[in-house]
């Protein structure tokens, strides 16, 4: 609750984000092709394998939003485990826990391009998620969307607060009240910012 009380409560801007101006950065840890997406997939999955280019090829994700297990295979749609029929995302998308458009409306638009790109690629902001759940979440706040996995709701609220605190992003009153309501049911939750 202490970190939540430090967030500015206000009215968010109604500007369109520049999300399409950003892409996953190359991360030099594995190879020249290893991106932020690979870093997050490797962090969040078990039994990870890599292709010859250094990208994550496969793995198993205990998906936090739904609580389901997803068998990731790069380049496959994986519709049976919640993948997008039209995408070849392996059933997993990398979600900005505070959606980029929501962050942009909450103050990210005041930061320069490099700072926004840092946000876009910050592993602390990103989570491997079921494509279907991420597509339903879109750019909603915790008022509009919560994980169906009850066991993850405290973590989700804490992540939202920590990310907003780290980047100096505001919340509106409804969002503040919903975060406080969720946190009241999990008083031992630690918020990392």
Question: Can you say where each PLM-predicted feature lies in the sequence?
Answer:
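C-terminal, well-folded lobe of enzymatic/effector domains
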Residues: 136-193
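Exposed alpha-helical structural elements
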Residues: 2-3, 36, 40, 155, ...
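Betabetaalpha-Me/HNH-type nuclease active-site subdomain
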Residues: 10-129, 134-138
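Short helix-coil boundary/hinge micro-motifs
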Residues: 1-6, 10-12
């Amino acid at each position: 609750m202490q970190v939540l009380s430090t967030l500015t409560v206000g009215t968010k801007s109604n500007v369109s984000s520049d999300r399409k101006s950003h892409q996953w950065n190359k991360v030099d840890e594995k190879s020249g092709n290893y991106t932020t997406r690979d870093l997050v997939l490797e962090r969040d999955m078990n039994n990870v394998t890599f292709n010859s280019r250094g990208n994550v090829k496969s793995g198993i994700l205990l998906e936090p939003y739904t609580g389901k297990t997803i068998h990731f295979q790069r380049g496959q749609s994986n519709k049976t485990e919640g993948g997008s029929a039209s995408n070849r995302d392996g059933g997993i998308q990398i979600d900005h826990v505070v959606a980029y458009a929501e962050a942009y409306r909450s103050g990210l638009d005041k930061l320069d391009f490099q700072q926004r790109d840092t946000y876009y690629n910050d592993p602390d902001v990103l989570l491997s998620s079921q494509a279907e759940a991420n597509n339903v979440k879109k750019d909603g706040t915790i008022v509009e969307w919560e994980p169906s996995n009850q066991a993850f709701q405290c973590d989700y609220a804490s992540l939202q607060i920590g990310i907003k605190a780290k980047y100096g992003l505001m919340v509106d009153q409804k969002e503040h009240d919903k975060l406080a309501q969720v946190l009241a049911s999990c008083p031992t939750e630690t918020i990392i910012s």
